[in-house]
């Protein structure tokens, strides 16, 4: 499961990707993404240390994207904030640990299964970039805006449980 910190980082990056050459104040991102300001400060510093963001202090300053939205993939963001992507320590690539109860990794069915899960997850996260998330957001907003208000009223009436 993604941490709140990781989800907030992704939301902040998508917001910044809307105007990638702009300088953003913490308050602006906090207000737009509904992220607590103090929490966001630490997130942006982590992104800066990772080389994803740059910053300038003082008048006319703020945070900027150092990498293009197409260069920032979800695998990098998830690893930065949440560490290993795999569900079991023996299936991680960058944070490998042998499981205490494992008799033989080479024949372990749990490890074999979760290596496949990890590989598929990593590939998906690597292929999803901040740019692709912004495109998805734009598409979803467009689809939401194109819905007929009358049909959504009918759906609300029939959706009661």
Task: Please give the residue ranges for each predicted region.
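Short alpha-helical segments that sit at the start of domains
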Residues: 1-12
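Short amphipathic alpha-helical elements of helix-turn-helix/winged-helix folds
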Residues: 11-19, 80
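Basic amphipathic alpha-helical segments that dock to polyanions
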Residues: 16, 43-48
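Short helix-capping/hinge SLiMs at alpha-helix to coil transitions
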Residues: 17-21, 67-68
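A short alpha-helical element within helix-turn-helix/winged-helix DNA-binding domains
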Residues: 27-33
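Key DNA-contact positions within bacterial/archaeal DNA-binding proteins
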Residues: 38
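Beta-hairpin "wing" of winged helix-turn-helix
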Residues: 51-66
């Amino acid at each position: 499961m993604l941490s709140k910190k990781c989800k907030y980082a992704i939301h902040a990056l998508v917001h910044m990707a809307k105007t990638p050459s702009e300088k953003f104040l913490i308050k602006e991102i906090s207000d737009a993404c509904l992220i607590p300001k103090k929490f966001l400060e630490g997130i942006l510093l982590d992104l800066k240390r990772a080389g994803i963001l740059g910053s300038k202090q003082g008048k006319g300053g703020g945070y900027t994207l150092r990498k293009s939205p197409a260069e920032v993939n979800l695998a990098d963001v998830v690893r930065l904030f949440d560490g290993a992507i795999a569900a079991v320590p023996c299936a991680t690539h960058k944070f490998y640990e042998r499981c205490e109860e494992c008799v033989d990794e080479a024949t372990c069915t749990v490890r074999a299964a979760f290596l496949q899960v990890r590989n598929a997850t990593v590939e998906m996260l690597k292929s999803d970039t901040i740019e692709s998330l912004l495109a998805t957001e734009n598409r979803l907003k467009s689809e939401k805006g194109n819905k007929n208000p009358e049909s959504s009223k009918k759906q609300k009436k029939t959706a009661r449980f």
